[in-house]
C-alpha cells in the first residue's frame, strides 16, 4: 500500500514570504531562492501573474526543503509568537477567506516525525516516543477517514476517567452553551473544522513545525518501530486524541 500524504495548513495571511534553498518545480518551471505571494482581488499574485492556486513540488522529495517566514505558533496561547519554519514535501497555496493559505503536503510518517518532536521533547525515552507515535498516528488516520459532521461531546461531572461520553446533535452550534447543569460542554475538534486541508499545524490539531525542531535518532527509531501501527477497536481506527497540560 502506498503511504498516504496529509495536507497540513501552516498559515493564512494576505502576504506570505518563503524561501527555496533547494530547487522546486511549479507549472513545469523550476524555481529557487526567496519568493513572495500576495492576495489580490481573490487571486494569488506571484511574479506578476494571478492564480487560483499554486503547487510547488520538490525535485528530490526525500531531501529538498522550503522555508516559510513569520509563521505564527501557539495561537491564542501565552507563548504565541512568529518564527521561520522549514519543511520537507510540497508547498501549496490556495485562496481562503480573503487570504492566502499555505499548505504543506507531506507523507504521513514524515509528518509524525515532526509532530512527536514538536509536541514533546525529542530527547524523551524511546518507549514514550513510540507510544506518542502510535497515538498521534491513530488520531490522524481517524480524522482522514471522517466524511462529514462535527462532533461535540458532553461529559458528566463524575470522575473524568469513568465518565460516559455522549454525542450531541451534530447541528448544535459550536459556540452555543449547554444549559443543563448536569453536563459540561466539551468541544471536540475534527478535520471538518478545516475545509481545504486535513489538519492544521498548531495546537488546534497537533503541533507540527516541520523540520524546524531538531529531531533525534530516538525519534526516527520510534517512528520506524511503530510504522503504520494504529490503535483499533472492532476493526475501526480509534480517535486517540490527547489533551494538553500547559
Annotated model-derived regions:
Residues 1-246:
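Conserved, single-site charged/polar hotspot
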Amino acid at each position: 500500500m502506498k503511504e498516504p500524504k496529509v495536507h497540513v495548513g501552516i498559515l493564512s495571511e494576505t502576504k506570505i514570504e518563503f524561501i527555496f534553498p533547494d530547487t522546486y518545480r511549479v507549472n513545469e518551471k523550476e524555481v529557487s531562492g526567496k519568493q513572495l505571494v500576495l492576495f489580490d482581488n481573490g487571486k494569488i499574485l506571484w511574479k506578476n501573474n494571478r492564480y487560483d492556486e499554486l503547487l510547488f513540488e520538490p525535485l528530490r522529495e526525500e531531501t529538498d526543503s522550503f522555508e516559510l517566514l513569520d509563521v505564527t505558533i501557539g495561537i491564542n496561547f501565552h507563548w504565541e509568537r512568529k518564527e521561520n519554519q522549514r519543511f520537507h514535501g510540497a508547498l501549496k497555496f490556495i485562496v481562503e477567506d480573503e487570504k492566502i493559505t499555505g499548505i504543506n503536503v507531506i507523507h504521513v510518517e514524515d509528518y509524525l516525525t515532526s509532530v512527536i518532536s514538536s509536541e514533546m521533547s525529542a530527547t524523551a525515552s524511546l518507549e514514550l516516543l513510540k507510544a506518542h507515535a502510535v497515538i498521534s498516528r491513530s488520531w490522524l488516520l481517524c480524522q482522514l477517514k471522517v466524511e462529514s459532521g462535527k462532533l461535540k461531546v458532553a461529559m458528566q461531572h463524575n470522575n473524568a476517567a469513568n465518565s460516559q461520553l455522549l454525542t450531541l446533535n451534530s447541528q448544535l452550534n459550536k459556540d452555543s452553551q449547554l444549559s443543563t447543569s448536569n453536563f459540561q460542554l466539551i468541544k471536540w475538534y475534527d478535520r471538518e473544522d478545516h475545509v481545504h486541508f486535513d489538519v492544521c499545524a498548531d495546537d488546534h490539531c497537533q503541533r507540527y513545525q516541520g523540520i524546524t525542531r531538531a529531531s533525534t535518532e530516538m525519534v526516527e527509531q520510534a517512528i520506524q518501530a511503530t510504522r503504520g501501527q494504529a490503535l483499533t477497536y472492532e476493526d475501526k481506527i480509534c480517535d486517540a486524541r490527547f489533551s494538553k497540560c500547559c
